[in-house]
Each structure stands twice: as C-alpha cells, then as structure tokens.
C-alpha cells in the first residue's frame, strides 16, 4: 500500500465499483474479461487494498467500514459474474453457428457391411439341420494325428499322412497337425456324447493345395454324423436329399456312386442335380458319404453289432461355387468388393 492512505469512504468505494462495472462491460471476450478481473478483483485491486486497510481503521468505525467494503466488493463481483454469463452465452452461440450441420445438403452414403457368403451358407446349413433335430459339434483346428488319421481307420502308410498333403506342427514328432478334414469331430463326438448321436460340424480345414480356380489351402467343410440303432444307407439317402433340397431348391435330387474312404464302409461319392442360379441344370459332384466303418465305432468304444451310423462331408467353397456359378474359387478369399456385392457385402 505504500505510504498513501486508502480512502474507505462510500464515494471512493462507489467509484471503484463503477470503474469495475464499466471495465467489465467493455470486455469483448472471455480472455479480456479474465484480465480485467485481475485488475479490479485481484489481490492488488483497489477493493482488495481497501479490505487490507481495515486493520488501520479505529475500532469504533471498523465494523461500518467493513460492511461498506464487503458490499462494494460484492457489487463488483456481481458485475463480473453477469458479464461472464453473457460472454459465455455469446461464445456458445457462435460455436453452434460455426459447427452447425446443414441438413439440406445431400448425405454421404456410407457402405454397409454384411456377412461373407461362406458365413451365410454355413449358417443356413446349420439352421437346416437344427430344424431336423440335429445338433452342432465343434473340434480344434490344430488336431492330434490320432483323431485326424488313426481313429478314422487311415493306414500308417496312407498317402494323406505325407507332408505333401498335410501341414504338420513343429517340432517334428509332435503328432500335431492342422486338420485335413472335419471328420475328427466324429471321433471326439462319439467319445464325448451319449448315443444316439445326430450332429453336424462346420469349420475350416487345411491341405497343402495350391490356390487356383478350384482349390484353396484353407477351406470350409460341413461334416454330418448319425449313429443309432438300425441306421442304413436309406437313412443316409433321405438325409442327403433333404439337405440338397434345402440348398439347391425343391427340384434338387441326389445320387451316389461307389467310392472308397478309410472311415466309411460302404463308401460313396454324392452327386446333386439342380437348376443353377444362372440357368441350366445337371449333375455335379458334391461330396463324400458312407456308413461309418466298424473300426471307427470300435475306436470310440461302440459295438458295431449293436449300433450303425452314416456320415457325409461337403466343401462349402465348392458348394457355393457351383451353386452360384462362380468360375474362380479365388474370388471367395481375395475380398474383391465387386465379387462380394451380389451377396450383400458392401451394398
């Protein structure tokens, strides 16, 4: 304060309040108002110095002087608060104007994703069999050689066991591999579930094929397995016909041709006749099937003289390819939007 006495009269205090009000009213933005607050309400402002000077006022006058100083400071503070509210409202209004969205402008169309056609097919197959009373079963993609080959009646020297056909997992001798088919789920299911069993398994499989128009090293299979008392090839044929009609239309029908698979006896390949989505009708090889081999049942602890079963397996990529007239299987894995658009992806 120095040696200069502070005037605590009502006139002096009123002048300090008036100066603060005028200064706050001139503030054009919040930054300017903040600077003026320091000048008029800060620790070195006239009203702050007036409060500090109360200690030098005679005791009999100090109470009245204190009330005057506090009232003046409250008036200045009120003027500041009112101007602060005004400037904040102006700022918010300006932001709303600057950031407003013109709803009359044409919108930018955002592409909408969808499920991959293989996923759509897999879900449709699952729904078809669930509606028939079957259940879903799953198994690991990294499989034990025991389940992939041994328990499925593959001889030790079968060519499918070679590294030219199968991806083995390091270290050598681990007897772990990437499953070459979904058939290992058959054995796992028979070991884990009570009979009778009616299950399908849908999943990825792996083989050392080169990627070309009709092959891919990673592909999807659907595997069906039924084990019960008294099952025959007639039950298998009926199941295949129902499956074909669900996927290819009510006119579809199947036929079977003798073949060999280690895990079924008798074994057959399945052909399906249908009217294609791009026109034309005819027979196409679809997959493999047969009655579950007695050795597979024995490996799961099931008496083949009491129970019998049938199994079938189809590739989803192949099914989608010939059902929809897709010339090149690589289109399914390369993510080209031009290919995916007809199925709803990116539409």
Curated annotation (Swiss-Prot):
Q: What is its EC number?
A: 6.1.1.20
Is-annotated flag, keyword Magnesium?
Answer: yes
Q: Which residues bind Mg(2+)?
A: 265
Compartments, record wording: Cytoplasm
Kindly report, in one word, the top-level EC class recorded for this enzyme.
ligase
Instruction: Look up the record and name the cofactor or cofactors this protein needs.
Output: Mg(2+)
Q: Which UniProt keywords apply?
A: Aminoacyl-tRNA synthetase, ATP-binding, Cytoplasm, Ligase, Magnesium, Metal-binding, Nucleotide-binding, Protein biosynthesis
PROSITE patterns cross-referenced by the UniProt entry:
AA_TRNA_LIGASE_II
Gene Ontology annotations of biological process type: phenylalanyl-tRNA aminoacylation
What Gene3D superfamilies does this protein's entry cite?
Answer: Bira Bifunctional Protein, Domain 2
Q: Which GO terms describe its molecular function?
A: ATP binding; magnesium ion binding; phenylalanine-tRNA ligase activity; tRNA binding
State where it is primarily located: cytoplasm
Listed Pfam families: Phe_tRNA-synt_N (PF02912), tRNA-synt_2d (PF01409)
Q: Which reaction does it catalyse?
A: tRNA(Phe) + L-phenylalanine + ATP = L-phenylalanyl-tRNA(Phe) + AMP + diphosphate + H(+)
Quote the cofactor binding remark. Answer: Binds 2 magnesium ions per tetramer.
| GO annotations of cellular component type | cytoplasm
List the HAMAP family: Phe_tRNA_synth_alpha1
Q: How the protein assembles, per its UniProt entry?
A: Tetramer of two alpha and two beta subunits.
- NCBIfam families of this UniProt entry? pheS
The family assignment reads: Belongs to the class-II aminoacyl-tRNA synthetase family. Phe-tRNA synthetase alpha subunit type 1 subfamily.
Annotated protein name in UniProt: Phenylalanine--tRNA ligase alpha subunit
């Amino acid at each position: 304060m120095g040696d200069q006495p502070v005037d605590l009269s009502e006139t002096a205090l009123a002048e300090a309040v008036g100066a603060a009000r005028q200064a706050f009213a001139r503030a054009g933005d919040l930054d300017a108002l903040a600077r003026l607050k320091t000048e008029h309400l800060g620790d070195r402002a006239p009203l702050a110095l007036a409060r500090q000077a109360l200690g030098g006022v005679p005791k009999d006058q100090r109470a009245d002087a204190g009330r005057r100083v506090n009232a003046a400071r409250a008036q200045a503070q009120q003027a500041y608060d009112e101007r602060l509210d005004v400037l904040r409202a102006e700022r918010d209004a300006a932001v709303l104007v600057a950031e407003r969205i013109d709803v009359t402008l044409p919108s930018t169309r955002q592409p909408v994703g969808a499920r991959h056609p293989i996923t759509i097919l897999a879900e449709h197959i699952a729904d078809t069999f669930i509606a028939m009373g079957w259940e879903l079963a799953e198994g690991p993609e990294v499989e034990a050689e025991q389940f992939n080959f041994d328990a499925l009646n593959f001889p030790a020297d079968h060519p499918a066991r070679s590294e030219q056909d199968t991806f083995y997992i390091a270290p050598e001798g681990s007897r772990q591999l990437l499953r070459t088919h979904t058939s290992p789920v058959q054995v796992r299911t028979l070991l884990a579930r009570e009979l009778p069993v009616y299950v399908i398994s849908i999943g990825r499989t792996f083989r050392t094929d080169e990627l070309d128009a009709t092959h891919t090293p990673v592909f999807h299979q659907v595997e069906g397995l039924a084990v019960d008392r008294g099952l025959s090839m007639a039950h298998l044929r009926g199941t295949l016909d129902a499956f074909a009609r669900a996927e290819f239309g009510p006119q579809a029908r199947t036929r079977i041709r003798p073949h060999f698979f280690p895990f079924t006896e008798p074994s057959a390949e399945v052909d399906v006749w249908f009217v294609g989505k791009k026109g034309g009708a005819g027979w196409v090889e679809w997959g493999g099937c047969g009655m579950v081999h007695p050795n597979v049942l024995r490996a799961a602890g099931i008496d083949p003289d009491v129970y019998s079963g049938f199994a079938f397996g189809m590739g989803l990529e192949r099914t989608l390819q010939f059902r929809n007239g897709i010339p090149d299987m690589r289109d399914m894995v390369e993510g080209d939007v031009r290919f995916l658009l007809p199925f709803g992806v990116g539409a």
